[in-house]
Amino acid sequence: MTDSFPVTVFHNPACGTSRNVLAMVEAAGYRPEVVEYLKTGWDADQLRGLFAEAGLTPREALREKEARTAAPELLEAGAGDAAILAAMAEHPILVNRPIVKTPKGAALCRPSERVFDLLERRPETFVKEDGEVV
């Protein structure tokens, strides 16, 4: 991470979008703090603060694909924020990724190009894993 402009990437190395975002940050010259949240886990307060900073509700940050198998009750309309946060703390895979935090704010970086809004500089060109040039 650069001293004057810290970048934190909440990262899942199995996710192509997350890998692209991390590579974009590094290509822009940053050395980010990488948090592999599947290993470190979350707590509800940490998630609440991160989502508030990113302007997300817990439901908006919920990865529905994983919720279908890990916690299908969260997909019901009556599932509240507290239940979603508790499930995310218990099953970190339920949090959509990647989330990036910088002095400019925090965001769920889907699509991956959203990360550029959080950086002071960007690479001149970047080629994603799938060959797309951004």
Label every model-predicted segment.
Residues 2-28, 32-40:
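Local sequence-structure signature of Cys/Sec-based thiol-disulfide redox active-site neighborhoods
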